[in-house]
Amino acid sequence: MKALRLSASALFCLLLINGLGAAPPGRPEAQPPPLSSEHKEPVAGDAVPGPKDGSAPEVRGARNSEPQDEGELFQGVDPRALAAVLLQALDRPASPPAPSGSQQGPEEEAAEALLTETVRSQTHSLPAPESPEPAAPPRPQTPENGPEASDPSEELEALASLLQELRDFSPSSAKRQQETAAAETETRTHTLTRVNLESPGPERVWRASWGEFQARVPERAPLPPPAPSQFQARMPDSGPLPETHKFGEGVSSPKTHLGEALAPLSKAYQGVAAPFPKARRPESALLGGSEAGERLLQQGLAQVEAGRRQAEATRQAAAQEERLADLASDLLLQYLLQGGARQRGLGGRGLQEAAEERESAREEEEAEQERRGGEERVGEEDEEAAEAEAEAEEAERARQNALLFAEEEDGEAGAEDKRSQEETPGHRRKEAEGTEEGGEEEDDEEMDPQTIDSLIELSTKLHLPADDVVSIIEEVEEKRKRKKNAPPEPVPPPRAAPAPTHVRSPQPPPPAPAPARDELPDWNEVLPPWDREEDEVYPPGPYHPFPNYIRPRTLQPPSALRRRHYHHALPPSRHYPGREAQARRAQEEAEAEERRLQEQEELENYIEHVLLRRP
């Protein structure tokens, strides 16, 4: 038996080396022979051939058993059918030797018949979708028949099937399967890309491959992993096969190599079937990608529109600011020109009269309001008050104009600019000095260069010619000289109080109140006052907004105190002020006039010291 085992091991190594070296890289065209009982009977009936003679047909059958299309390896084969074929290859009986196996012939024939019937039942039950797992045939496990079961012919058959599996899962075959799967996946990808680009809708935006489009679209929930096949569940990688116990403990190489061959078989089956669910994307996934692409496109357009609106708002703000600056400069120039002309027209006396008129109008308005005591004003008084207020505003505007002009001159006086002297300001000033009467010795001198430079810079900033600036300064100087040469103005006497438009006759004293009548009972206190006369009508006055006004009962005093309402005359001190009040008012007016003249003089001195400085 040891010699048989050694010869079987050597034969296994020789067949393995020859099979791996002589395996053709191409695709064989022969189909695997059908496994049936008729195919096994001649092998069982023949005599035991030599090791080389018996291995030749098995090797050729193993070489011809490669499938035609390696790209579709086990694509249409049921895992249960594949497991049954492998079990049949493992359980194939061997023919007993002629001289020494005569005493065990009936037992082997009975086992072979039982195995043949089991395999046929499995083959017929393969098309059924839910067939129970075939039961393993009962095999005796006595230590006596263990060594005898390991026959060389049985080992040869197991080695031939193992060699076929090794050839199927060689590195070159696995590489060809990967290339075929990649080519098929790429074909399906390009097909999906072409259909996606040619279909109407927002998919036209992505002119790229499906991979780039899928990279742009946010990832969705991953697909569930494929469920493990029945073959993988039934045939684990690490667990030994229950049908391999018939080889005995001595022959361990078929079990080891078969376990190693089944592991890449299940992995290859999963690897071949895995790319197709990934490449065949359902219509819902395409629709989801298109919706996500549309959302991305809308977000991009919204961002571009927001940036455009922001740029437009910035441009409009800059244009508005520039327009306001131009308008402000124009208004300043117009204000200076109009204010100076109005000030020249009014003069010092005109300003004083305007202030006096304003004060008188204000006093008249206050007196009229006090006389009327809340009554409506007359339209003429409103017009006079409006005119007085307008004149007061004009006078105040002229004063502010002079102050503003002085501030501008003060701001520009300190700037030193190295510019060439212009002849126009000096010539104009000489002519003005020639036309003036007399004049002091200072008027004959020319203006210093610093003053001329400040005038030029001021005219440039105010958008005014230098001649206009010089003329304004000359007018201020002439006014100052007239004020010095003019006699002092007398203080105006205090004006008499205006005569009242109407005088109220003194009212007679109110009559004595009538004796109190019998009051109504307390429970009738909430009712109207029945003791009032029916024809009693109250005239409109401060206590009655309109005639026959009835005040609420809850806010009235007792009936004894609310008989009649009399309008008492106002105290005479409010309408006819005394001499003390008139003197006090005249003193206030004189002080106000003095303050105004002092401010005007300070303004003129300020302008003189800033713009008319002499060397």
UniProtKB/Swiss-Prot annotation:
* GO BP term (any one): insulin secretion
Task: Describe, from its UniProt entry, the tissues in which this protein is expressed.
Answer: Central and peripheral nervous systems, synthesized exclusively in neuronal and neuroendocrine cells.
Name the coiled-coil region(s). none
Assigned keywords, A-Z = Amidation, Antibiotic, Antimicrobial, Cleavage on pair of basic residues, Cytoplasmic vesicle, Growth factor, Phosphoprotein, Pyrrolidone carboxylic acid, Secreted, Signal
Per the record, where are the segments of Basic and acidic residues compositional bias?
415-433, 577-599
Under the heading InterPro entries, the entry gives: VGF
Give an example GO molecular function.
growth factor activity
Where would one find the signal peptide in this protein? 1-22
Low complexity biased stretches: 179-194
Residues that the record marks as modified (Pyrrolidone carboxylic acid) are Q310
Mark the residues carrying the PTM Phosphoserine: S420
Q: Does the record's keyword annotation contain Hydrolase?
A: no
Reproduce the UniProt comment on modification after translation: Multiple peptides are derived from VGF, with activities in synaptic plasticity, antidepression, penile erection, autonomic activation, and increases in energy expenditure.
Q: Where is this region: Disordered?
A: 22-201, 218-257, 342-600
**Which of the residues bear the PTM Phosphothreonine?**
T424
Among its keywords, does the record have Signal? yes
Which regions are flagged for Pro residues bias? 25-35, 129-141, 487-497
User: Residues bearing Proline amide?
Assistant: P577
Q: Which domain of life is it from?
A: Eukaryota
**Acidic residues bias locations:** 378-394, 434-448
The record's GO CC annotations read:
cytoplasmic vesicle; endoplasmic reticulum lumen; extracellular space; Golgi apparatus; intracellular membrane-bounded organelle; transport vesicle
Specify the protein name.
Answer: Neurosecretory protein VGF
Source organism per entry reads Homo sapiens
Q: What is the lineage of its organism?
A: Eukaryota, Metazoa, Chordata, Craniata, Vertebrata
Q: Which gene encodes it?
A: VGF
